[in-house]
Design a protein with these regions (language model features):
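Membrane-embedded alpha-helical bundles that constitute the cytochrome b-like, heme-associated redox core
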Residues: 1-287
Length: 287
């Protein structure tokens, strides 16, 4: 039963159990006051929806329940994801890029370009280190990685250094185009990464020579600039496992979740938020 607002007692909020009232009970003492309903919405309580769960598993949830992602406060999941992205991934990712570029610059200007002499003439013998297939796999993966890196950097950091220069219209079109490049090049990266792993994994298993290489700092310690190793030295093996294979698998997997290509994942917002945080963090690590 509704009630005229002018007939409502001014001290309705002082009644016992006022804070625990349902929306129907509140309407009897304060018509038009939908606070109980909106309080439940803000707490992530699932409401009624006529859509089947199989088609819209979150149709009854306007605001996600409270969670705490690494680096966020206890708040609703959408806000927690925003805090992790804007307060951790973006600023610390940009700082990591700056540190790496600075280190590369210092190394280049102190050591100079590192090249190799290729003697020519009678008696010169060349040894094939990589087959044409291995080179093709490498460059296919490298092309895909560069395209994904450029498009990812623009989407994540572009508003800080491109938007002020290009303006919102051009930057919007550029981001839209690169987002499509990101989506279509992603499968090429996934396939070429699998080929790279299967092709080179046998030569990247640790052995005793790797400990010798590490003990001499790859030739920087002890004066021996050519430390013996097998096909790949310990540094190259570390890059293969911790710079390519392991993070690459998680980047590809999280990307497939974001594209909703893995059955059972990506149907709810929390899946997308977690996948996005993993994807961004490890992609920055790989770059």
């Amino acid at each position: 039963q509704g009630q005229n607002i002018f007939d409502v007692k001014p001290d309705a909020s002082a009644e016992p159990g006022y804070a625990e009232q349902t929306n129907g009970e509140r309407m009897k003492v304060q018509p038009g006051n939908n606070a109980p309903m909106w309080r439940q919405v803000g707490q992530g309580v699932t409401g009624y929806s006529s859509l089947p769960k199989t088609q819209a598993p979150e149709a009854g949830n306007l605001i996600q329940p409270f969670v705490q992602y690494p680096g966020s406060r206890v708040t609703n999941a959408g806000e927690a994801w925003r805090q992790v992205r804007n307060q951790w991934i973006i600023p610390y990712g940009a700082a990591l890029f700056a540190i790496v570029l600075l280190a590369l610059g210092i190394f280049y200007f102190t050591k100079g370009p590192l090249g190799h002499d290729h003697p020519e003439g009678p008696g010169t013998r060349r040894i094939e280190r990589f087959t044409p297939f291995e080179r093709a796999a490498h460059w296919a993966n490298a092309f895909a990685f560069i395209a994904l890196a450029i498009s990812g950097i623009v989407m994540a950091f572009g508003k800080f250094f491109l938007l002020p220069i290009m303006g919102s219209t051009l930057f919007g079109w550029l981001t839209y185009a690169l987002k499509n490049v990101h989506n279509f090049v992603g499968p090429l990266f996934a396939v070429s990464l699998l080929v790279i792993i299967l092709t080179f994994v046998k030569d990247n298993i640790a052995n005793r020579a790797d400990f010798v290489w590490l003990s001499k700092g790859g030739g920087m310690l002890g004066g021996d600039h050519q430390v013996p190793s097998h096909r790949f030295n310990a540094g190259e093996k570390g890059l293969f496992w911790w710079g390519v294979t392991i993070p690459g698998i998680f980047v590809v997997g999280s990307g497939l979740v974001l594209d909703k290509l893995i059955p059972g994942f990506g149907d709810v917002r929390s899946d997308m938020q977690i996948a996005h945080m993993i994807h961004d963090t490890l992609a920055i690590w790989m770059m």
